[in-house]
Regions:
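Predominantly late transmembrane helices and immediately cytosolic-facing juxtamembrane segments
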Residues: 68-108, 168-171
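Membrane-interfacial helical/loop segments at transmembrane boundaries in membrane proteins
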Residues: 53-61, 134-161
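Glycine- and aromatic-enriched alpha-helical transmembrane segments of multi-pass membrane proteins
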Residues: 114-132, 158-171
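Alpha-helical transmembrane segments of polytopic integral membrane proteins
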Residues: 3, 51-52, 83-87, 91, ...
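Alpha-helical multi-pass transmembrane bundles of energy-transducing inner-membrane proteins
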Residues: 1-15
Length: 171
């Protein structure tokens, strides 16, 4: 959605042509950077929780030896790509010198264009800070029909300690 706002307000979504938008669109830049940080899996945002859960599943899978060894490595590499594209978007679009050859002079969008992004960024924060309260009941309701019995024990928490998924996140 942030890319759509940027495209609408600047006339392009070509990342090679965009830079310095934080000076012209500071509020939109802040929203986009929080969303980008969530995609990168930064702690206290929803993406961190989902990334940790994904990493945990790759570490604790029971399969053939080569799958058990390769899957966490592949997942870690995929995680680094998420960080890379999130950083590239943030740095290239919002920082650096102001772009000079854009079809339109960028400015903050109308309120109605920001509301959906604001709601999603708020959801990223709420899920990241209060995972058990915000998505715990929904996850249990969705998993129950699939499992068909008692759900296995799981924890939706901000911190699970220093473990393999956390080390994978740090890489």
């Amino acid at each position: 959605m942030a890319a759509g706002i940027i495209d609408h307000e600047s006339g392009t979504r070509d990342i090679r042509k965009l830079s310095g938008l934080i000076k012209l669109m500071p509020y939109t830049a802040t929203l986009a950077m929080v969303a980008s940080a969530a995609m990168a899996g930064v702690p206290l945002l929803n993406g961190f929780l989902s990334k940790e859960m994904f990493f945990a599943e790759t570490v604790f899978i029971t399969s053939t030896a080569w799958v058990e060894a390769a899957l966490p490595v592949i997942a870690t590499i995929a995680g680094t790509f998420s960080v890379a594209y999130s950083l590239r978007f943030t740095v290239d679009v919002f920082f650096g010198p102001k772009a000079t050859r854009l079809p339109h002079t960028p400015h903050e969008p109308p309120r109605w264009m920001r509301v959906p992004v604001e709601l999603l960024v708020l959801a990223c924060l709420i899920v990241g800070i209060f995972p058990a309260l915000s998505v715990g009941p929904l996850l249990a309701a969705a998993a129950q029909p699939v499992v068909g019995g008692t759900l296995p024990e799981y924890s939706l928490a901000i911190w699970h300690g220093w473990n393999a998924p956390m080390i994978m996140s740090l890489i």
